[in-house]
Amino acid sequence: SYGRQIGDDDSHYSERRIFAKYYPAVSQIPQEGFFCNNANSALLRSVWTSNVFDEELTGLEDMELAKRLVRAGHRVAYVAEAPVFHHHQESWPQVRRRFEREAIALRAIMPEVHLSRIDVLRCVLESTLGDWRSAKRNGIKSSSRLDMLRYRWNQYVGSYIGNHEHRVLSRRAKQKYFFPETSKDTDQDEWLKSVRRPPAHEG
């Protein structure tokens, strides 16, 4: 099982929208598929002793493990009631490299997923416009429009670099893992509104 991840006003707003897409407010127990994240997760000791992370991967080792477990008959649960703040304090080159590493790993996990240059342009445009609309709707002042564009550019250019080899295209898989969320329900997530986590000593 794994829990919800959220950001606050110290996070890039674009990343907060990514969290809202992958970590919605409603639990799924069990969920479909093998998406998960080990930043906030739990696994039976008996399962872990015989199923460990693939340390050769450049990222997404949690998803790769979940894929193996689902194939073996296990199930993955998403628990929205167990949230954590997840922050990335990164420069723009670091943002790009993180998405590049994840895309390289995704090639090993889902080799049918391919991102073209046209996909990159479409994703950058649609995601950035979506960020701008959502930020205006939620009264966000902590991230500038330029920063949202920069984030999305580095996100998708990094993903393209890591996923540049031509592969059999699965439109459904590509839509799920690369394309921006367009649901109005997602943009109404309470954690997309202006908020900042309290200092640790305040509980």
Identify what each model region corresponds to.
Residues D10-R17, Q89-W92:
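Short aromatic-enriched loop/helix-cap "lid" or pocket-rim segments at secondary-structure transitions
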Residues S1-Y13:
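Short beta-strand-to-loop element that shapes/binds the nucleotide-sugar donor at the catalytic cleft/hinge
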Residues S41, S46-N51, E56-H88:
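A short, conserved alpha-helix in the catalytic core of glycosyltransferases
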Residues R98-I104, A108, E112-G203:
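Non-catalytic, C-terminal membrane-associated alpha-helical segments of glycosyltransferases
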Residues R16-Y22, Q94-R97:
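Short, hinge-like loop/turn segments at secondary-structure boundaries
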